[in-house]
Amino acid sequence: MQGYIYPNEYELHWGLLVAVYPYLTGLVAGAFILASLARVFNMTEVQPTYRLSLLAALAWLIAAPLPLLAHLGHPERSFEIFLTPNVRSAMAMFGFVYAWYLMVVLLLEIWFDYRKDLVVWSRGASGVLALVRRVMTLGASDLSDRALRFDRSAGKLITIIGIPSAFLLHGYVGFIFGSVKANPWWSSVLMPVVFLFSAMVSGIALMLLLFMVTSMLRSKPVDMRCADKLASLLFYALIVDFSLEMLDFTQRLYEAEESITILASMLKSRLVLSLIVLQVSLGTIVPLVALAAVAPTVKKEGLVKTPEELRRLIYFMVGVLIQIGIFSTRWNVVIGGQLFSKSLRGLTVYKVELLGLDGILTAAAILLLPFVILYALIKLLPPWPEAEAAMPAEGAEAQPMAQAS
C-alpha cells in the first residue's frame, strides 16, 4: 500500500479470473474474423485455416463464461439474467449476445459447413463416433447439388451476420470498462475499439500457432503460403492496435487531468513489468520488428531473406509473445484500474493466490480447457483439407441413396 486509500479499496473486487475472461472472448472474436476472411472475402491463402478457426472459436467460446462463473459467489444464479432480464444492464444483455453467438452464429455455420461431410462419414460406418455424427445431421441427408448450394449460401450469410456479432461479443467488454466515468484508467471512448483490434491480434496469432503446431503433429509440411499470409495480417493488425493504444495514451497525457499524477505513479511502480516490459516491449515492439524483418509485409520476401525453417521458428516465437502481451493488456486494464484509490492519493497492491477459485491454478486450468475441447472437436469434425477432399468421391456414391430414400 502506498499513500492514502479508503478502507474498502484495500482488496480488489475483480481478480485474475476477470482478466482471463476478456482474453478468452478476444480469442473467439479474432479466430472467427480470420475465418470470415476465407469465407466472405475469398482470401484463398488462409483457406487452410477456415475450419480450424471455426472449431477454435467454438472451443474458446464454450470456455469463455467459466472465469466469470468461478468468480461469482453463487454461479447458479447466473440463469436469472435469462429468466428475469434487465434490458438496461449491459452485463445482463451480454448473456443474450453470448447465446446468440453460440447457437445462431457458430453452431449453425459449423453445421452447414460440415453437413455434407457428416452425412458421408456416418454412412457405412459403425461405432459411437458414427452414431454421434448421424445424430448431428439432424436427419438432413440430402446430398443433391441444390442442397449443397443452399448449405454454402446459408453458411456464407451466417458468416456475414457473424462478423458484427463477433465485434459485439468482444466490443461490449471494452464498452463496459470505457463507460465507467468515475475511473480515469478505464474511461475512454477508444476502449471498445482497442479491445476489438487487440482481439484480432490475439486471434490471428493463436491461429498461426495452431496451424503450425497441428501441421507438425500430423507430420504434414507447414503451408508457408498460408503462414506468411497469417503473419502479414498479424503485422498489419498489430500496427493498428498499437497505434490506437498510443493514441489513447497521448490523449490522456495531453489532457493531463487531475488523475495523471497517480496514474503516472502507478505506471512507474505497479505496472512496470506487466505494461512496459510484457505488453509494450515483448508483446508489441519485438513482434513488430520480427514480422517486419521476415514476413512478406514491407517487401515480398521480407526485409531479411530467411529460410522457411527459421521463419517458422520466428512466427512461433512471435505468436507466443503476442499471447503474453495481449494477456498482459487485459491484466493491465482489469487489475490496473483497481490499484489506485478514488481519492487519487494512494495505491494498493494485488497479490495473486496459487490456490482457490481466483488463484493461478484455476486460471491455468481454464486457459488449458479450450485446448482439450478443441482436441475433442477435431476428433469429431476433422478440419483438415485432406479429410474434406476425400468426400466428393464417396458423396457421389451416396447421393443416389439419398435421392432414393
Feature-to-residue mapping (PLM):
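Membrane-interface segments at the starts/ends of alpha-helical transmembrane spans
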Residues: 6-17, 84-91, 146-153, 182-191, ...
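Loop-to-helix transition at the N-terminal end of transmembrane alpha-helices
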Residues: 12-23, 46-58
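Membrane-interface transmembrane-helix boundary segments in multi-pass integral membrane proteins
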Residues: 17-21, 92-96, 191-195, 257-287, ...
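Long, contiguous internal "core" modules enriched in hydrophobic/ aromatic residues
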Residues: 43-44, 105-312, 317-318, 325-328, ...
